[in-house]
Every structure is written in C-alpha cells, then in structure tokens.
C-alpha cells in the first residue's frame, strides 16, 4: 500500500492542470506525445486533401480544374507537409509517448525541451498553413532548388514562409533527437543494459543520431538562402559568384538520410509488432541492431544519388551508384529477420499484421525500383518523371504509413485505455492496399512513357489519359480507406469499453509485454529478465 500511495502522489504531482491552461503548459511526456500525434494526423489530412486535388487535375487531359500557379503550390505543400510535418513528427510523438514506458522511467530527460520542440513544430507548421490558406504558399517544389527559389525568380514572400517555417520544424526535430538520445543512454531502468533494451528504443536511438547529423545542413542551407533573398548575398546565384549546386548538396545531405530517418522508426514498429503477432521472440536481435546502425552510416554516403544528371564527374557517379546499391544489404537483413520471425512463430492476421503484410509487398517493390534508379543510365532516363514520384511513394508510404497504421492498431488500446474495437479495419486495409497500388503502379507506367512530374496538364495525343484516370480513381479509393481508419479510431475512442492499458489487448496472446508497469521510482521495483530482454515488475512476468 505504501508503494501504491507513493505512486498516486507522484501521479498527482506530475498530472497536468485541467483545461486549456494545462494543455498549453503541459510537460508530461504522455500529453506531449498525444499532441504531436494528433497534430501530425491533422497535417496528414491536409496533405491528403492536396494530393486529391493534384490527382483530380491530372485525371483527364487538358484539365482546367486548377490553374498552373495553384497546382505548383499544391504539389509543393503536399511534399512539404508529408515529409516535414507528418512523417518525422509522427515518429517524435510515438517515441515521446512510448520511450519512458519502455525504458522504465517516469518521463524523458528534459520535459521542457520536449514542450519547446512541440511548440516550435506547431509554429512552423502554422506558418506554412497560413501561407497556403492565403494563396501565398511556396511553389518551388518541396526541395526548393535555387535559382528557381532565388530573389530573381521568386520575388514574393512565398519561399520565405517555407524557409522560416521549415527551420522551426527542423529545430523541433533536433530537440526531440537530443531528448531521445540522452534519455536512452542515461535514463534506462536499473539493470537495463543497451543489449536488453526493447528493439524500438534502439531504432529511436539510431534515428536520433541521424537527425543530429543530417538536419543541421538543411538549417544552414535555409538560413543561407533566406539571407540571400533578404540581403542580396550571392550564396547560390551563379552570375554573382555563387553556386546553385551548393543548395543541392546541403539539401540532399539532409534529404537522403531523411528517407531512412523516416523508415527506421517504422522498422522499429515492425520489429515490435511481429513477435507479438507471431507469438515468438524476435529473430536476430543483434543483427537487426547492427543492420540499423549500418543503414544509418551508409545513408550519409548517398546524397549524390539525387544529382546524377547535374554533370558530376564519372568517378563520383560510380561511387555513389555503388553505395546506393549497397544500402539494400542492411535493409535486406532486417526484412529477412522479420520473415524468419514469422516463419518461426504462428502469425495471426489481426489488424496490425495485415498492415505489416501490406508493408512487405509495397516496400519490396519500392526497394527494387530503388535499385533501378541507383543505376546511372536508367536514372538519366527516369529522372524527373512520374516514375521517380511513384518510387518515392512506394518507399515512403510503404515503408512508413503501413507500419504506422500497424502501430496505431497495436498501441491504441494502450493510449486510450479501452479494449480493442475496430469494426472497419479489414475493409479499410483492403481499400488502402488496392488503391495505393492502383495509384502508383500506374504512375510508374506513365513515367516510363515520358510524363514529367510536376506538370499541371498534358495533351490528349500523349496517350497518358487512361493511365492517369486509373491512377486518380485509385487514389480516391485509397483516400476512402484512410478516412475509414480515422472513423475506426473515433469509434474505438467513443464506443469501446474501458479496459486495462495493455499495448495490444489481444488477450489470448501471452507473450510478455515490453512495458515496465512500475508503481514507484525505487530501483528495487524493476527487474530485468536477461532471457527475454523484457522488464518485469517484481516477481510477476507481466
């Protein structure tokens, strides 16, 4: 009883104030994690609406649904929102919520830094939304290449909104990375060595180190471009002694590791969910950790992969082409470990497992097309076509959204404190899976036929009309499926009965959970089971 009383007193001390004041001033990791996730979901909805507008415009030849200027703003904001305001913040929110529970600590190392990071993210995102709603959104593409975005060709304030807003978002990500790194290295439960951590914590640590290394170049580039636009200093203007390729180097030093920064947290979700769904232990824990570290290291040697058509020397082309192919090896190690885990166990097709199977199909196709574009002659032909857009979506949607949907269905009972109730999940998954592949397989096809990305219309004589119509209809099917997931979450939140905060709430699955359900902060209340790498409470196996 004394321990339970201490637990209740600590809960009262750490609880946020009721009402809006508590919401805006909270430094509790659970509150901030939910705030990150809800905000990221809101931006995902905005980005999805923009995607539907883009596909509506491209559904038929010579369409006048939107004009060229609005179309440029839509595709720029769609890419910006999905890459900067949805993908990375979703990882941040998930890690902020879960890591203390996984590590056996009451909160992260610097709670106020977590709150500061959230409000930086919210402010940067709000700047971009304001620009969109007032018709002054950036229109230079989500990677904002100079000289197109320089003061000569973009004299308005559209680009400035992007540069300032994204800088705040990047600062937010760095705050989260510092938080995760310190918490994982210094705030683990007594007895939890690094080799006994939950696998998701390893992925969070590797991703955080990548953020700390990869995001400063983009912040530097954004500051330099804004200074050039505001004060006329010629960092990227070739006619004044600058170098426009400098921006590409700075951006892709961030941008290509960003792909793996997005993928690795999703891989952490998969490595967590598969053993539970298969009712066995994770195969190759050490190999998976090593492959994640190798993937992080190799990702910083690939940035010129996006610059094969810029006239760089042939020796550089050969090196980066080989490195781009080599990165498939550590990725393959993880995929084989996941397949081996399922083979060793007895997987059951609950909702998380369905989305993981969708991930396997989609991500493998994306990986194969990635090897294709790593070959320089093919990249010269496919560069800046719809093929590249489709490949990117296969890697990022397949490598991130499907695993995150699995994570939502897996952890939602833990977050909500309600028993599992998902009435639309199977139908939603079918619509998402079929709609996604219909959209982007068609986009691969039309890209190989020569359709450039970012064009707002095309002539009927090109023969692209039927393929684009199939792609657009499929995208709306996918959107309906994603909307049904949202409805499923709402139904769960309002209809499902209260229950224990169990991570999956599949009561017939008896594998121990990875969460140390502690009732005090004393060291003796937590024990580490060296055989299962799981935290145990007292003598119960939880």
Give the positions of each predicted feature.
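Short, Lys/Arg-rich, polar N-terminal cytosolic tail immediately upstream
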Residues: 1-21
């Amino acid at each position: 009883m004394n321990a339970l009383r201490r637990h209740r007193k600590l809960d009262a001390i750490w609880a946020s104030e009721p009402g809006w004041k508590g919401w805006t001033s909270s430094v509790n990791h659970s509150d901030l994690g939910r705030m990150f996730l809800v905000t990221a979901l809101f931006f995902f909805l905005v980005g999805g609406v923009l995607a539907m507008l883009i596909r509506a415009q491209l559904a038929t030849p010579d369409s006048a649904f939107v004009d060229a200027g609005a179309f440029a703003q839509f595709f720029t904001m769609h890419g910006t929102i999905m890459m900067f305001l949805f993908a990375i913040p979703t990882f941040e929110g998930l890690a902020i919520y879960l890591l203390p529970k996984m590590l056996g600590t009451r909160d992260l190392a610097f709670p106020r830094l977590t709150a500061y990071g959230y409000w930086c993210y919210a402010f940067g995102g709000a700047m971009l939304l304001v620009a969109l709603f007032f018709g002054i959104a950036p229109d230079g593409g989500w990677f904002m290449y100079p000289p197109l975005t320089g003061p000569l060709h973009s004299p308005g304030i559209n680009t400035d909104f992007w540069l300032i807003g994204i800088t705040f978002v990047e600062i937010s990500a760095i705050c989260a990375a510092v938080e995760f790194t310190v918490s994982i290295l210094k705030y683990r439960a007594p007895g939890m060595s690094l080799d006994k951590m939950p696998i998701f914590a390893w992925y969070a640590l590797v991703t955080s180190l990548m953020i700390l290394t990869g995001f400063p170049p983009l912040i530097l580039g954004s500051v330099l471009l804004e200074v050039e636009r505001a004060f006329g200093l010629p960092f990227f203007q070739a006619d004044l002694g600058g170098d426009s390729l400098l921006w590409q180097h700075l951006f892709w030093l961030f941008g290509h590791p960003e792909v793996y920064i997005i993928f690795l947290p999703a891989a952490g979700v998969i490595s967590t969910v598969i053993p539970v769904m298969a009712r066995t232990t994770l195969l190759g824990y050490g190999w998976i950790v090593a492959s994640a570290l190798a993937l992080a290291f190799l990702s910083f040697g690939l940035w010129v992969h996006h610059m094969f058509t810029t006239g760089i020397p042939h020796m550089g082309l050969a090196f980066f082409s080989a490195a781009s192919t080599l990165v498939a090896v550590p990725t393959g190690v993880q995929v084989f470990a996941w397949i081996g885990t399922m083979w060793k166990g007895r997987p059951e097709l609950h909702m998380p497992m369905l989305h993981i199977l969708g991930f396997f199909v989609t991500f493998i196709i994306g990986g194969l097309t990635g090897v294709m574009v790593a070959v320089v002659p093919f990249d010269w032909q496919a560069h800046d076509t719809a093929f590249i857009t489709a490949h990117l979506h296969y890697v990022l949607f397949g490598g991130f959204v499907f695993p995150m949907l699995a994570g939502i269905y897996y952890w939602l009972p833990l977050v909500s404190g309600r028993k599992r109730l998902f009435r639309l999940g199977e139908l939603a998954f079918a619509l998402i899976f079929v709609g996604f592949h219909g959209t982007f397989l068609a986009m691969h096809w039309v890209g190989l036929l020569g359709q450039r990305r970012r064009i707002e219309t095309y002539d009927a004589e090109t023969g692209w009309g039927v393929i684009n119509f199939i792609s657009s209809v499929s995208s709306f099917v996918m959107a309906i499926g994603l909307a049904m997931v949202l409805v499923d979450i709402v139904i769960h939140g309002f209809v499902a009965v209260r229950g224990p905060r169990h991570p999956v709430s599949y009561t017939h699955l008896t594998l121990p959970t990875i969460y140390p359900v502690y009732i005090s902060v004393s060291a003796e209340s937590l024990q580490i089971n060296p055989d299962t790498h799981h935290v145990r409470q007292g003598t119960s196996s939880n």
